[in-house]
C-alpha cells in the first residue's frame, strides 16, 4: 500500500545517498530538470492526524496541504532568502505549471503530496530536499526500520517528544476528542450553508440561457401542468430540447453540404449550348444564344406582315432561314474599344459622326460553324439589316432575354478548320477579320498579321489562350477590340462557385474514403499482425487457431453450454505443467544455481531478454505469501502501512496476530515469482462480478466460468458485489442469498457477519450505506456439471450492500447502482495504495482478502470486470492478463462478446453482425492507436497500477484519485452528467481513463471471448439502445475535448472521435439521404455516381472484412439481415433515443419482483449524516482491534506483540490464542 515503491524495494533514496545531507555535499541549484516539483519542507508533505469520522475528514483532510500550494508562486520563491535564482516562467515545462481543478492529474497531485516521497513526472528517483535544513530524529518514512505492528510512529500513543527543536504530533486528550465530535455537525451544516451562497449568486451559463431561449414558448407553469413539477425535470426537458435543436442544426448543415451547397455557390443549372448544336429556334449574337421562337419583327422591307397583323418571325417565316445562325453583324458593337483603331476610309459611304462609325462589317448573318464566306453586298439598300436606329438598339438590349451561353471546348478551339483563339475566357474568331470592306473602313496592319494563318503571329495564338501574350506585348487594346467585334462564344469552364463546390465535394469524398479505408486497412493490420502479440503463448485450449475459433462459435451457440476443454484435461497445453515451466530456459546437466543465488529463484542474466514487470516478479525478494518463512523477512511493497513501527528491525520480525485474525488454513499457496506457466510473469488479479437481480442459474454459470479459467488460483480472487438485497422476477430467493449459497469455508460464520458503513455514490441520506463482507472459497455445489477432480479452489469474497437499518423496511435496501459497486472496489484500491483513511467496510475488505489469499491487497495489479450474466471462455483471462503484462502501457482492454441467443427472434438476429462489426472493425481500428473509446462493462479489464520509471516505482491507474473522484461524482445536476453517470457509467469509466491518461493504451484482445444474452424483444432493445446511444453521444462529447490523444489535425484520434460524434448525431438524416439518393438515381438519368460509389464502399467493406476475418461463413447471412434492418439501427433507435434524452430510467432491461420499471437518477431526500461513518488508516484500525482484543489501550506490549527486556531490547510476546495456526503465514502487520 505504497506509492511509489514496489515490493523488493531497496533502501530509501535518502538512505542510499546519505551524503545528500552531509555538510560536505555541494548545494546545487533547484533546476527544473531535476525534479517535478519545487522543493518544499518535509513538514509540508506529512500526513495530517487521522480523524474518526467522515465529517472531520471532509472538513479538513490535511490542513498543511490545503494551505501550501504544490507549486509555489514566483512571489513566494522570490522572498526566500536562501533560494537560488529561478528560471523564467516561459521555460517551465507544462507538467510543472500550477495544477488547477481542471487539470487531469489534480487529485492525484493532492493525494501524492501527502506521501513522504513526491511523485516524479520524469521517471527519475524523486529528490527530497529539506529547504529549511531542519531534520527529524528517527529513520525516514518508507525505510526498512518499521516493525510489524502496523502502527505509524505518529499514531502510537505516547508522550510528546522533541526532534530538532520541533514538537511532534502528540495524542489528543479524551476531552478534546469529545469536543471535536460535538462540533462536527455544526461545522458540516455551516459549510453546506456557505456552499449554497455562491450557487445562488452564480450567473446562468450560456448553455442554460440558450436552452431557456429555445424553449421560451413553454413556461414553467405549463410544464408543471404537464407532469413536470420538479425543477430538475423541467431543466432536463429544456436541455433536451436544446440538444435536439443542435442536432437538427447539424443535420441541416450536413444536408446543405450534401444537396444545397452546390446549388448555393454554383447557382441554378445555367443553360449552356455547345457550338454547332444550337437549334433553329435560336439566333447567336456575340457568343450568346437568344430564343426567338415566339418573337415578331416589325414590318420592314423583306419582312412581310402576317395575317394576324404582326410582323414575321425571323427564324421561321423568312425564306433566308435565320434560325441557328450567328447574327452578330446585325447588331455590331461599334465605337467602343475599337474607336481609333478602325477608322473611316476615304470616300467611304458608312455614316459617321466624327470618329464614330455606324458599322464596321456588312450586316449579314453567318453560319455558326464558320463556313460562311465574306459577303460585301446589301440586298435592298446600303446598310440594310444593320439596325442602327435607337429603337432597334433599345429593343435588342432591353427587351430580348439571353437564353444561353454558347461554349467551345478546347477541341473545338484547336480545330484546324477554324481560326480561333481565347482571350480572357472568350473565344474570338480571326476569320471574321476578312469581312472588313477595305473600301469602307481602314484597319491596323496588326489585324492583317493576326488573321493570316501563314503568319508567325497567327500561329503563336491560334488554338491557344493568348491572354498573357496580348498582355505582355502591348496589344491589350487590340484584344479588347476583338472582344467587341469578333467574339463567337466562351470557353467551356465552370464558375468560381462551381469550382469551389467541386473542390468541397471531392475533398469531402477523399476525406470520407480515407477514413473508411484507413479504418478497414488498419483493422486488418491489427487482426493479422498486432493482436497476436497480446495473446498468451500457451493456454488450456488448443493452439490451432482455426479449431479454437470453431470451438468458440459452437460454445457461443448456447448460454449454458460448457467449454470444449477444461484446464487440466488431456491435450491441454498447460496440463500437468512441471517445474520446467518456472523458466523458459532449456534443461541442462550443468548447475543453474550456486551459493550466491537467491533463495527465491534463479537470477536472470543481463544477456537474457528482460521480462515484463509485475508486483511479484520485479524483485525476487518480494513478499509472496505464506509458502515459506523466507518470504517473511521484509515487506518492501507495503512500507507505508504494514511496516510502520520505527522501532522494529529487519533481522527480528515481530510475530503477532494477523490482519484481524488468522490467514485461512486452506489458502492457495503462492508459487515462486519466476513460475511462468503461460510464458509471462503472473500478475495478481481481482475478478469483479457485479450482481443485481440475477437468478441462481445465471449466477452459477457465470461464477463457474470465472472460477474455471485456466489462470492460476494463487493469482486470482473472485469478488462479487451484490447491489442491494434484490429478488429477481420469478425467483424464490434474493440474489445475495444465491451468491452466499455458492460459498464455503467462510472465515467468519455467515450469521456472525456484521454490516459496516461506507460512503455511497448517492445524494441525501442515501449517501450513507452499509454492507457486509463474506470471505471464503467458491463452492461448485453438489449438482455441478464440473467433475470433482476438475473443481479448483478459488478464493472468493462477497460484498452485500444491505443498507442502513432505516432501509430494511423499504424496497431494494442497499441498492445504489452499479457505479457505486465499482467505486467500492476502486476507492478501496486507492486507499490501499496511498495508505489513506478508509472506512470500516474497506478495512474489513482488506482483512478478508488477506485471509483467503494470504497476500496483501497491495499486490493486486489488475481488475477483471464481468457482469453476472456473462460467461467467460476458459483461456480468456489468461490472454487478457498476458496483454497487460507484456505491455505496461496498456491500462485497459476488452475481449469479444458473442451472442448466445442468436436465433431466439428477429430482434436478436439483427444484433449478431452489429456486435461482430463493432469489435472487429471499430475496436480493432482504435486498438492500433491504443484508443478504444468503449470498453464494455460486461467484459473488460483495467490496470490498478503500473510500473513507472526507475526500479520500485508504481503509478496508480484505476486507483488514480482523479479517476476515482470523477467517477464517484454524486452531484449529478445536468443532463450531460446524468447521461454520463446514470446511463453509461461503464463507457464513462473508459472516457475517464483516456482523459486522465491520454498517452496510455486501451486495446481490444480478440483472443479473449465471452458470451451473453441480448434482448429478444423490440421494446427491451429500444430501451437498451436508448441508454447506449445517449451515453455514446455524451461520452464522445467528453473525448473530443481531449487534445492529447495520438495524432494531429485530421490524422488524429481526436478527429476520428469528432467524425464518429457527428456521424452518430446525423444517423437519422443519413439514412434518409441514402434512400433519397438511391430513389433519385433510379428515377433520373444519369444517376449520381459519387454517392452511390461511396454508399457501396461503406456497405461493402464490412462484407470483405467478414470474408477475411470471420470465423464462420454464417456471418454473411447475419450481415444481410443487418443490412435489411438498417432503418431500425439508423433511424428508429437514434430518433427514439434523441427524444428520450431526459429519460434516465433503465427501462425493462432487468425486472425485479414487484417492480414495473427501474429508475435511475432519483433525487434522494434527507440529509447525509457523515458522523456515522468512521474513517481511519488501516494501522489505526488494526491498533484498535488489538487493543480491544487485549483489553488494554496504549500498551506497547499489546500493540506490537512484544515486551521490552531489561537490556532495552524488544522481544516477542507470548503467543496469542491462534498463534500456532497463523504463525507460518503471517509476516508483519
Curated annotation (Swiss-Prot):
Residue spans of biased composition, Basic and acidic residues class: 92-105, 164-177, 187-196
GO CC terms, sorted: cell septum; cellular bud neck; chitosome; incipient cellular bud site; plasma membrane; prospore membrane
Function of the molecule: Polymerizes chitin, a structural polymer of the cell wall and septum, by transferring the sugar moiety of UDP-GlcNAc to the non-reducing end of the growing chitin polymer. Might function as a negative regulator on expression of other CHS genes.
Glycan attachment points: 608, 635, 1030
Protein name, as recorded: Chitin synthase 4
Traits of the deletion mutant: Does not affect vegetative growth. Does not significantly changes in the chitin content in vegetative hyphae, nor in conidia.
Gene3D superfamilies the UniProt entry points to: Spore Coat Polysaccharide Biosynthesis Protein SpsA, Chain A
UniProt subcellular location: Cell membrane
GO molecular function annotations of the record: chitin synthase activity
Region (Disordered): 1-196, 539-589, 601-648, 1210-1229
Alphabetic keyword roster: Cell membrane, Cell wall biogenesis/degradation, Glycoprotein, Glycosyltransferase, Membrane, Transferase, Transmembrane, Transmembrane helix
One GO-annotated biological process of the protein: ascospore wall assembly
Keyword Glycoprotein assigned: yes
One Pfam family from the record: Chitin_synth_2
EC annotation from Swiss-Prot or TrEMBL: 2.4.1.16
Chain segments annotated as transmembrane: 203-223, 241-261, 496-516, 1055-1075, 1089-1109, 1115-1135
Compositionally biased region (Basic residues): 18-27
Extracellular topology ranges: 224-240, 517-1054, 1110-1114
UniProt membrane topology term: Multi-pass membrane protein
Amino acid at each position: 500500500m505504497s506509492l511509489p515503491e514496489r515490493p523488493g524495494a531497496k533502501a530509501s533514496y535518502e538512505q542510499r545517498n546519505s551524503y545528500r545531507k552531509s555538510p560536505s555535499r555541494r548545494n546545487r541549484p533547484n533546476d527544473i530538470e531535476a525534479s517535478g516539483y519545487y522543493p518544499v519542507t518535509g513538514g509540508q508533505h506529512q500526513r495530517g492526524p487521522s480523524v474518526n469520522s467522515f465529517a472531520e475528514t471532509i472538513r479538513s483532510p490535511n490542513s498543511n496541504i490545503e494551505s501550501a500550494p504544490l507549486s509555489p508562486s514566483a512571489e513566494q520563491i522570490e522572498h526566500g532568502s536562501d533560494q537560488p535564482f529561478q528560471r523564467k516562467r516561459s521555460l517551465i515545462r507544462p507538467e510543472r505549471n500550477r495544477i488547477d481543478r481542471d487539470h487531469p492529474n489534480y487529485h492525484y497531485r493532492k493525494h501524492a503530496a501527502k506521501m513522504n516521497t513526491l511523485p516524479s513526472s520524469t521517471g527519475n528517483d524523486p529528490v527530497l530536499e529539506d529547504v529549511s535544513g531542519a531534520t527529524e530524529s528517527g529513520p525516514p518514512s518508507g525505510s526498512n526500520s518499521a516493525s510489524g505492528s502496523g502502527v505509524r510512529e505518529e499514531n502510537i500513543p505516547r508522550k510528546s517528544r522533541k526532534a530538532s527543536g520541533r514538537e511532534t504530533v502528540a495524542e489528543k486528550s479524551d476531552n478534546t476528542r469529545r469536543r471535536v465530535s460535538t462540533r462536527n455537525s455544526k461545522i458540516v451544516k455551516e459549510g453546506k450553508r456557505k456552499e449554497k451562497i455562491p450557487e445562488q449568486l452564480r450567473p446562468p451559463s450560456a448553455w442554460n440561457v440558450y436552452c431557456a431561449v429555445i424553449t421560451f414558448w413553454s413556461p414553467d407553469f405549463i410544464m408543471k401542468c404537464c407532469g413536470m413539477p420538479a425543477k430538475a425535470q423541467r431543466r432536463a426537458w429544456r436541455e433536451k430540447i436544446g440538444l435536439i435543436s443542435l442536432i437538427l442544426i447539424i443535420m441541416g448543415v450536413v444536408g446543405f453540404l450534401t444537396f444545397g451547397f452546390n446549388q448555393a455557390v454554383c447557382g441554378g443549372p445555367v443553360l449552356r449550348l455547345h457550338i454547332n448544336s444550337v437549334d433553329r429556334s435560336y439566333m447567336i449574337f456575340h457568343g450568346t444564344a437568344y430564343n426567338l421562337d415566339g418573337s415578331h419583327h416589325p414590318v420592314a422591307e423583306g419582312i412581310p406582315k402576317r395575317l394576324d397583323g404582326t410582323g414575321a418571325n425571323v427564324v421561321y417565316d423568312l425564306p433566308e432561314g435565320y434560325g441557328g445562325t450567328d447574327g452578330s453583324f446585325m447588331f455590331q458593337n461599334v465605337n467602343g474599344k475599337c474607336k481609333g483603331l478602325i477608322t473611316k476610309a476615304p470616300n467611304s459611304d458608312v455614316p459617321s459622326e466624327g470618329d464614330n462609325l455606324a458599322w464596321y462589317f456588312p450586316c449579314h448573318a453567318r453560319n455558326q460553324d464558320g463556313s460562311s464566306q465574306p459577303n460585301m453586298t446589301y440586298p435592298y439598300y446600303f446598310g440594310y439589316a444593320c439596325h442602327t436606329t435607337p429603337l432597334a438598339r433599345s429593343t435588342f438590349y432591353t427587351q430580348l432575354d439571353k437564353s444561353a451561353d454558347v461554349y467551345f471546348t478546347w477541341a473545338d478551339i484547336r480545330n484546324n478548320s477554324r481560326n480561333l483563339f481565347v482571350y480572357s475566357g472568350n473565344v474570338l474568331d480571326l476569320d471574321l477579320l476578312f469581312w472588313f470592306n477595305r473600301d469602307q473602313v481602314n484597319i491596323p496592319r496588326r489585324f492583317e498579321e493576326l488573321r493570316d494563318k501563314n503568319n508567325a503571329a497567327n500561329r503563336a495564338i491560334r488554338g491557344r489562350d493568348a491572354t498573357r501574350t496580348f498582355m505582355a506585348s502591348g496589344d491589350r487594346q487590340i484584344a479588347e477590340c476583338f472582344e467587341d467585334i469578333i467574339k463567337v462564344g466562351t470557353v467551356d469552364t465552370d464558375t468560381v462557385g462551381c469550382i469551389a463546390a467541386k473542390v468541397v465535394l471531392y475533398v469531402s469524398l477523399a476525406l470520407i474514403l480515407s477514413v473508411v479505408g484507413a479504418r478497414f486497412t488498419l483493422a486488418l493490420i491489427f487482426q493479422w499482425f498486432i493482436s497476436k502479440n497480446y495473446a498468451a503463448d500457451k493456454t488450456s485450449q488448443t493452439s490451432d487457431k482455426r479449431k479454437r475459433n470453431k470451438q468458440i462459435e459452437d460454445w457461443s451457440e448456447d448460454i449454458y453450454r460448457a467449454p470444449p476443454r477444461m484446464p487440466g484435461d488431456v491435450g491441454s497445453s498447460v496440463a500437468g505443467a512441471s517445474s520446467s515451466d518456472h523458466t523458459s530456459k532449456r534443461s541442462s546437466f550443468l548447475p543453474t544455481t550456486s551459493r550466491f543465488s537467491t533463495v527465491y529463484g534463479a537470477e536472470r542474466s543481463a544477456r537474457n531478454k528482460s521480462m515484463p514487470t509485475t508486483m511479484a516478479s520485479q524483485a525476487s525478494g518480494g513478499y509472496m505469501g505464506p509458502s515459506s518463512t523466507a518470504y517473511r523477512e521484509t515487506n518492501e511493497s507495503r512500507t507505508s502501512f504494514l511496516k510502520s513501527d520505527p522501532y522494529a528491525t529487519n533481522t527480528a520480525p515481530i510475530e503477532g496476530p494477523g490482519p484481524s485474525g488468522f490467514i485461512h488454513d486452506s489458502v492457495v499457496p503462492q508459487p515462486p515469482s519466476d513460475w511462468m506457466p503461460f510464458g509471462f510473469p503472473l500478475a495478481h488479479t481481482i475478478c469483479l462480478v457485479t450482481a443485481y437481480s440475477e437468478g441462481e442459474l445465471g449466477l452459477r454459470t457465470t461464477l463457474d466460468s470465472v472460477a474455471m479459467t485456466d489462470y492460476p488460483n494463487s493469482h486470482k480472487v473472485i469478488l462479487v458485489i451484490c447491489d442491494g438485497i434484490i429478488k429477481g422476477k420469478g425467483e424464490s430467493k434474493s440474489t445475495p442469498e444465491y451468491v452466499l449459497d455458492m460459498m464455503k469455508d467462510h472465515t467468519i460464520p455467515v450469521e456472525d457477519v456484521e454490516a459496516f458503513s461506507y460512503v455511497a455514490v448517492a445524494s441525501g441520506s442515501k449517501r450513507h450505506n452499509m454492507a457486509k463482507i463474506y470471505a471464503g472459497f467458491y463452492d461448485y455445489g453438489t449438482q455441478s456439471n464440473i467433475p470433482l477432480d476438475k473443481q479448483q479452489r478459488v478464493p472468493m469474497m462477497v460484498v452485500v450492500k444491505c443498507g442502513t437499518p432505516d432501509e430494511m423496511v423499504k424496497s431494494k435496501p442497499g441498492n445504489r447502482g452499479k457505479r457505486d459497486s465499482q467505486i467500492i472496489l476502486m476507492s478501496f484500491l486507492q486507499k490501499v495504495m496511498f495508505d489513506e483513511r478508509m472506512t470500516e467496510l474497506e478495512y474489513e475488505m482488506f482483512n478478508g482478502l488477506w485471509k483467503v489469499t494470504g497476500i496483501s491487497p497491495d499486490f493486486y495489479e489488475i481488475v477483471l470486470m464481468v457482469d453476472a450474466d456473462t460467461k467467460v471462455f476458459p483461456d480468456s483471462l489468461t490472454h487478457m492478463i498476458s496483454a497487460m503484462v507484456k505491455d505496461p502501457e496498456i491500462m485497459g482492454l476488452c475481449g469479444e462478446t458473442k451472442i448466445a441467443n442468436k436465433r431466439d427472434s428477429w430482434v436478436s438476429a439483427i444484433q449478431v453482425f452489429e456486435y461482430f462489426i463493432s469489435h472487429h472493425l471499430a475496436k480493432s481500428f482504435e486498438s492500433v492507436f491504443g484508443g478504444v473509446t468503449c470498453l464494455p462493462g460486461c467484459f473488460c479489464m483495467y490496470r490498478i497500477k503500473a510500473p513507472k520509471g526507475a526500479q520500485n516505482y508504481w503509478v496508480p491507474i484505476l486507483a488514480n484519485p482523479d479517476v476515482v473522484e470523477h467517477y464517484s461524482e454524486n452531484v449529478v445536476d445536468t443532463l450531460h452528467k446524468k447521461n454520463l453517470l446514470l446511463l453509461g457509467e461503464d463507457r464513462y469509466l473508459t472516457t475517464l481513463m483516456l482523459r486522465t491518461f491520454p498517452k496510455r493504451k486501451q486495446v481490444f484482445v480478440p483472443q479473449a471471448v465471452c458470451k451473453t444474452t441480448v434482448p429478444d424483444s423490440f421494446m427491451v432493445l429500444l430501451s437498451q439502445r436508448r441508454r447506449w446511444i445517449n451515453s455514446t453521444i455524451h461520452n464522445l462529447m467528453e473525448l473530443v475535448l481531449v487534445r492529447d490523444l495520438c495524432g494531429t489535425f485530421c490524422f488524429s484520434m481526436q478527429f476520428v472521435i469528432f467524425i464518429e460524434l457527428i456521424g452518430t448525431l446525423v444517423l437519422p438524416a443519413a439514412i434518409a439521404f441514402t434512400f433519397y439518393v438511391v430513389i433519385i438515381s433510379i428515377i433520373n438519368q444519369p444517376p449520381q455516381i459519387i454517392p452511390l460509389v461511396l454508399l457501396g464502399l461503406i456497405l461493402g467493406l464490412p462484407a470483405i472484412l467478414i470474408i477475411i476475418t470471420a470465423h464462420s461463413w454464417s456471418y454473411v447471412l447475419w450481415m444481410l439481415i443487418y443490412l435489411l434492418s438498417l432503418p431500425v439501427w439508423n433511424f428508429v433507435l437514434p430518433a427514439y433515443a434523441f427524444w428520450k434524452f431526459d429519460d434516465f430510467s433503465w427501462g425493462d432491461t432487468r425486472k425485479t419482483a414487484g417492480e414495473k420499471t427501474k429508475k435511475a437518477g432519483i433525487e434522494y431526500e434527507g440529509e447525509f449524516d457523515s458522523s456515522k461513518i468512521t474513517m481511519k488508516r488501516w494501522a489505526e484500525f488494526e491498533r484498535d482491534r488489538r487493543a480491544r482484543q487485549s483489553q488494554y489501550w496504549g500498551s506497547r506490549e499489546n500493540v506490537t506483540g512484544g515486551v521490552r527486556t531489561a537490556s532495552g531490547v524488544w522481544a516477542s510476546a507470548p503467543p496469542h490464542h491462534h498463534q500456532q495456526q497463523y504463525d507460518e503465514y503471517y509476516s508483519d502487520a
